Amino acid sequence: MITFTFMSLVTSVKDYVEITHKLIEIEPLKNYTEFGAVFTYFIFSIGEFFKNFFSFSFLNNIWSIPIIIPDIASAMISEVSVLDGYFHNAFTFLETSVNTTTNPSLVIFEKFVIGIINSLFLILPTSTSHLITLRRFVMQGLEAGYMAGLGTLAGNFLWLASIILGWRFFVIPWLSLDIFRYLLGFVLLVKYIWDSSKERRMALEDLSKWKIFLLNFLLALTEQSCIYPFISNLSFGPDASILEGFPVDNYPQFLLIHGAYLLGILFGSFSLLQFTCWFWENPAFSIYLWITTKSSLKISTSSYYKILNFTFLYATMLCAIASIPYYGLDYTITNPIGLVPQDRILNQKKSQSDPDKLITETAFLNLNPTDKNSRIRDGVHARRERWKQRLIKYQAFDASTYDQGVYDFLTIEDLNYGFDRFWLRRKMRNHQIRFRLFPGPWMRSLKKQLNNPANPSLETSTKAASGPRVEFFRILFEQFYHPNFHDRAAMQTNPAEARNKFISTSPLASTESKKALNSTFSLGNINNSSTGIEGLVLTNTQATLLPTDLQTKRTIKPGLIYTNSALRKFVRNVNTRLNLKLLNSKETNLTTKYKSQFIYSKRWKSIFSKIQPLQNGTTRKSYQLFRNVAKQILVTPDAKSLKLITINQKLSLKERKLLELRTQYNNNSTLTTTAPLTLVRPLNVYLQKEEAFKRKLRYYGTMPMRKLTVGNQAPYFKALMKRGFYYYKPTLRWRKTLYVASLRRGFRKKSRKQRILVMPSNQQNFNNTLDNTKTNINQNNLANPLGGNEVPMYGADGENSLITKPTHSYTVLGKRASRYRHQIYKDVLQHWYYTPFNRLLMKFDVDAFINRQPKSHFLTKNEERALHIRRFLLSEHYDTLRWYTYMQHYKTMKTNIGGTKSFANRAYNQQFQGTFKKIRHLFAITPKQGDFYTLKFDQPLYNDNKLKDNLYFHEELLTDYYNGTNLQTNQTSNISVNSTTTFIDNSLRTTQLPVPSSSFDIVNQSSTLIGLTTMQNALRKNVVESTLTSLNSDGEAATSQPKLNFVYSELFVKLIKECKKRIHDQTFLKNYITHRIEKREQLNQEQTKELNKRLEKLKVWLNSDKGSISKLQNTPVQDPNISSPDKVLTTAMQKAVNESISLSGIMPSDKIKTTYGNLTNAYTIKTENAILTKLNVINQLTNNETTTQKNTLIKSIGVNKIQTVLQTIITNFKSSLYNQTQLLRVKTDKDLQWWRTKQRVITKRKSARKRDRFKKQIAVVNKKLAALSKKVETEKSNLYQTLYGNYEISDYLLRNVPTGSSAVIDSTVLRKKQDNQAYLPKETNNVQFNSFVDSNNNVWQTFFAKKLRKKISSKGRRYRSLSLARYLTATRKPRLVGLDNLTKIDNITTLQGAFITKEEKQDSLNLTIQRKQELTNSLKKSQIKKRSRHSWKKRSRHQFSRNHYKYRKRHTHGNGKLRVMNKKLKKFKATNELRQWWWNSFLPRYLSNLQVNNSTLTNKNVSFKPLSNTNSVPSTNMASPTTSRNLLDNLNSSNQISTSASMNQNIVTESVKVETNQVYLPEGEKSFDITSMTTTLPFYAGWDESLKKFVVTNRLLSRRDAGLSVNNNPQEINFTNPPIQGLNEGSFLYWQTEMPFNSYNIDQFITTNQSFYAPLGWRRFEFRHSILKTWVNNTKAGNNNIKKKTLIISLKNLQPLKSSQQKQNQIKTKKLVARRIKKRYKLLKQMPNQLMYSPTGPLLTEVLPSHYISVFDQQYRLPRNRYLKRNPLKTLKKTTLLALMDSSKQTNGVNKEFTLRKRVKPRRKYHRKRFIKKDGLIFPRRTKFNTNTTLTGNALITNNVNSIEEDDLRWRPSSRTKQKRKDNTRSSAASKTKSNKRVKTNPLRLRQLRRREFQQVLKPLQRYIPQNGGFTWPGDYLRLEIVEMPKLKSINIKKTSLKQKINVQPVGIMPRKYLIEKHNIKVLKKKLSQAYSTQQLTKVVQEYKNLIQNSPPAI
């Protein structure tokens, strides 16, 4: 740093002196004696230096070295100071001009000093030789480093001396061998690296010294790649560089000065080398000693040398590798032939039209790996010539927008970016062409040279390769060959003409002879013509030349249009390819009259496209072929023909008009035109216009596929479809491929340029447009639009042509456009698209974008159909109002585009088609057939929850609602709107037609309403009137309303669809309508019958249950002042009813979330609506006696009293009568009581069996225990007598359970309760009746036990294995059941078989009473006995071998009958189990929680957010019947709104109901709560409260919320459904290609992995794992007096009830937690790899790529289906009673959301003993998140007496057990029962450990193993399958002797049948639960209970 500062100081001093003298105008310094100014500036500079040094500003320069380096490089080049960039004099340390002549010694001294200073740059360690020198110093000592430094110094000095002294004999050969120098240096480096890789410190020999010296010497000479480009610009002198010489006068002076400079460099370098040696000997050695001994690092010597050796070796290797690309390939090849690096001639093209390189031999140079044409450049991949022109440019890229305002025709979505041209590249790959040794341009140039004529003339020799003859025959035979070209029919008619034609086209004829022949022949024809000039003006001169042709008959051939088009193409190509040098002519100026007018060829296009029937087509075609060629050669300066003379004459206007008339007359007289008279133009003009219009429409239509034609660039996708998804026969496909490949011209279409017509110089223009419409114009003259006399002349000023073709579909081919296109390609495509990282990001982004939409936001198939029909009808309606039908091409446009571009059409296209065109191009898309969802971008219709609690609401309906309710209040009184059902379609959100209530099924839930106008027209009015009329009549009339109206409306959409298919098939329509109507009526009748049966059961059951239902104090209140409506309906009343109908279903009720998931399907909703309708009708019939009567207040009160008394009498009479007739009831009448009895009998029987079995075993072991068992039996009977109370299971159906003192009753007591106890009044217990019933039951029970008990044989035991009773209640493990006032202790034996003594039992009972306050309502858990794996395998083997045997050989005995009976028994038992679960488990719990679940809401804060579309608004159950008067009066002034169950509306109640349903309405309070809805359309116009203004917006595009959202109580937790309900069919693929850039080869889609279409927007959805989450019902914190009663649920219950005060999972988690370790399907080791059929379909019905493998596939998303129940471990200890009691002590917690977690890594268990916890439970590694406290509001509410043990935190899965804290309240009995905890180890396990013969490894096997490049979703994991290794069998002689011979199974057994049946039972239970847990059923059942409770008591 000091050196640098000193250098800059010296230069700045000199600069300062010069500038100062210049300012004072004093001469510059002539010597070094003027010290005044220098000293002054020197002082200032020293001050500046110290200032910079102490302020540490020099550190800035060090830190900013990466930024300074470019400045240094530029300073070197521009000769400014590197050390100080502020001054302009660079390295002029001393001026050479000072005393140059006067004192040579001073100059020599100056140069010597400059050399010393410049030697600094030579010693900088910038080259490999310096690195090697440094390594020699470090590794091999001072001597080796010194020798290496000398070698480097000698090499540098030699090179500098040879340059400065001008030793050409050395410099020029050495520089010309640059490749040799490079290779020599590289080889030396590689050898050095090889030798020194294992080199250590050693003593040097003389030979090694020379090696070291020579290596560095040669490297310094060869390696100029690092330092010399920079060192050449470094110098401290006034010269440009170090290597520059100095100006001298004579030769001795030259030697002296330059020798002094070189000596200075040598001296400086040698001094620096010596300095380095000194530094290495003293300071560096001391630093090394300090590092190795004293520093804290204390690196050992070996590691020190190892690190240094590694560092230097790698640095040297990096230098060697970095020098590889120093000489490029282009320089290496082109340097020997004299080209400079990056010579521009390498990239130069031959011409603008010919894209070949000028030097074809070096065409492969300067190609990047990602070059846009690298796939088809002939130098890289030699292709056939026809592919090169097609793909040489991306001509479809719209670069013309930047150039002169000419636009391409293609839209932005149809542009092609290379990767979507893969089908084209595939066709190129499939070409039958081998790679040629020579590139294409070489071969083509060779061919053209060989094809030259033998004696070329002077004119053709200049362009030999493209002579006219070569081009002519190449065009003729290679491209436009046709058999008619060679027809020789004309040879017989006119031999001379044929001969001339043959000569003119003969390959042997030279150009000169051909030209002479043609000119003379043409002159002869003109002289012989009868019409003279007029014949020349016409395009068709065959009339004069061949008069015999006029008399021949005109024939039109079918292939005429193709022949003519081929000829047209041929002539057009001849015109462009003819030698232009032969066609030079003088150009004369045209008249300005015609020059001012610009003529477009569109005007002439129709004329040229006319197809005239030619006479004797073959003859005339062959003549035309000749004539077209001859005519081009005719018009040359040499041919002085009459035609040219005539053209050059100027005609006056009058003469020109006469000429036109004569031409027209002659044409009409000599030629018969065949154009139709009625058309202005020939028919083919219109046909061609239509075709062109269709081609345009092809790019804009909504067609799913585009037609694959040769010229159409767009439909690459269809080629993909054909190759990958459709199966064609090979012959047909091969033929088509060959046909397309043969059309070379289509694929060779270049980027076209404008065709320019240049007029001849001396030509007169003839205005014959009228004439040309009727004359027969030769089609082949496309380049001659003004007739046959105008010939295209190509000159220098071709741009000034008059007639220019339109360029709207052309790409401009010019320098500017190509430059723009290339720049766009480089900037956009190469950087953004072709980068692999960006392509990967784009793929992920597109995947995420397509997967961001929830699956539930899709419309259903039927909704899409209905929406499509409505939009179609709406657009058809719009078409009638518009002028489209008067358009010229209306039919074509309508069929191609699909109708007009109205607003509805635009919305439809945007929604259904989307903008997936580019995605279709760039990404693979799976086609699919059938009815599937269509992916849309904007979804106005959401389908989040298919239940009726989260309906959307639009704010515009609010005002109508309030207006309507006011009107309704004034006009209506006792109207029950129940018989009019208004359906809210949960997916389409449209209010359907109100029809009379009946049980009907909905075909399409969106199909009844076609437009909103129908609700406002006469149809709605008629329906409303008929509805009100039916309301005023009796209830029977309402139900018997004709259903035909609705049947027609629901079939409307389906009829439209079928009519569109069979629009003319009337018989089909008739049959279809009759069939559909009959089927619908039949279905309705069946449903009605079924519903009636169910309702009868429900009524009997509810009536029988009267004694258990408490009375409600609510009675209907009626207003006598309001009269019922008359028959004459006023308009106000109709309007009010209209509003109520339209809004009755919009206000949803809050569904209380029960245990079961809220997954419903469409059928459940339909059935539920039908059931509700029936229930409402019957409710109205039973409850609404006073609906149509006019009553005063006194009358209504009297009637109410009488009604209450009567109902009480009737109900009590009914129940007592029912109790008496209970005994006489038939056994088949299976109600709840029957099932309860049956369950009790089964339970008693099985427990008795078990107890007997147990007693026998104990008696065998110890005979003394028999007496003890008798003693306990007597004790039991005493318990029955002493502890028996009035408790019944049916008490759970009571509203008020009698609260007595807590009693603990043995559970065996409860098994002997009387059956009819529930139906007897509690006050009058009939003892005789009870005993009679009991004895009766005992008699029947003993009878059945004796008669029907059958010993099961060993044969029958095999079939019994599938019995469901085995799983139902096989064993009863000890359990605790906590009821409201009762606790039962189940078993009275300990686990060791000993009986509990009386004292122990009493202690445990006392302990239970002490703990009663801590227990929540626990579930009665019955442990299903799980079969061990051994027994499961044994059963499966039996079944497997039996099935195989069944198919091999038939049994002659009764095995077949037994099998059939067994199957029937299994089905019956499955049904029986469902029945049992329904009656015993679900219905009692459901009724019990009915009242408690009437959870209430507090006042909510309502915020008006008009731009949201989703909200869930909870509401409450309404259980008290009121009249409509009550509803309307309290709508705006209530805190609690109660509505009757007959109203199909749900109003939010806002007061807290505790026990009674008496409604108190506080006056004066006006608050309302409104649910949130959405309308059908996405547009909203209304007031936005947050913006404070009126807005009109699209809600889908808005980020704001919309609607009225109700802020829920924070204590409530509302869970939404999982985002995907059902998924599409699983498509399969594997990514097997190994090509890096092979984009979407269809052959790689091998169907091995299952996936589905992932949802959009799943990133923002907080996904909760379904099985890890329990659906919680939280009641309010303040309602402590409301208690939920937990039912005794079925032993086969699927999901246990989860109430708010209990921990749902406690017992299950404790007892069965180890089951998660093992899996059910251990035997599924072989997974069949079946290929699934992936259906295909049109593009618009499937738009998602198939290779998006998602996390949320159904089999992985729902763990119930994925991870089945595990087997418990054999070492699991039976849990004691107190452990369960302790576990039930935990409090319920806040239900946290759970995340997807990674699976546990497999643990290698090498001879490990399984670790057993103290309490006998094995906790798995993969456990649930558990919480222990409940956060209610801001306070922690706990149900424990003890304090909270843990915070409200989730604990992660842990392998450690959560140890329970010892409780001080635990008694001695508890410790006694928990003392015996040791579980004995399996002796087989110990034997295994001793033998050490087997290593047990739990290996995870992947279900699907992805091959190379397989996809896994980001963040997902590959799912593993644990396969258990077989254990060693124990050698047991007795077991072996007892074994039977069994058939060995061939493959692993898959227990599918059992699992599927079990799964189906679960699904049925869920569906039944959901069907009966809906809000409406709750209300109806409650109404029946209220009806019974409110009836007067029996007198």
Curated annotation (Swiss-Prot):
This is Uncharacterized membrane protein ycf78. The keyword DNA-binding does not apply. It is found in: Plastid, Chloroplast membrane. Residues 1418-1441, 1848-1883 are annotated as: Disordered. It comes from the Eukaryota. Residues 1422-1441, 1853-1863 have a biased composition (Basic residues). It is a multi-pass membrane protein. Essential for cell growth. May be involved in binding chloroplast DNA to either the chloroplast envelope or the thylakoid membrane. Changing K1588R: In strain: CC-503 and cw15. The keyword Transmembrane applies. Changing L580V: In strain: CC-503.
